[in-house]
């Protein structure tokens, strides 16, 4: 049965990489853009508890409202995405959760292929099922690497760039 399925070793895959500081490399259209450390050595890195709850909740609401309650996949969004994409004959609608977006950005490329999507799903399943990285840490990394404007990556860069504020000071005003 599936509860007995265990992976004894991940080899050199580095699936636990997000648990500590790591270098994140940004690529667009297979072209290297820049890299930066995700962790305390980066002055723009912002721990989760120092990010405004308004911003955290806005991201959760817009990207993946059930992030802290699912195991990496939102089946309803995935089904709707597949139906729309098949109907239109192209990748027109995404069904990615925050977990899936994070794995794509940290471990894979942005190419929209079935093979890449399968890799993404497998890595998400491995990390979530085996609790390799906590949900809080995954959300923290996500908020520190997502592109929030041209060459603006993570809330530590975005808050001062757009609002002249620290991430903790973001509000609804």
Regions found by a protein language model. Name each.
Residues 1-173:
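Juxtamembrane regions of bacterial inner-membrane/periplasmic proteins
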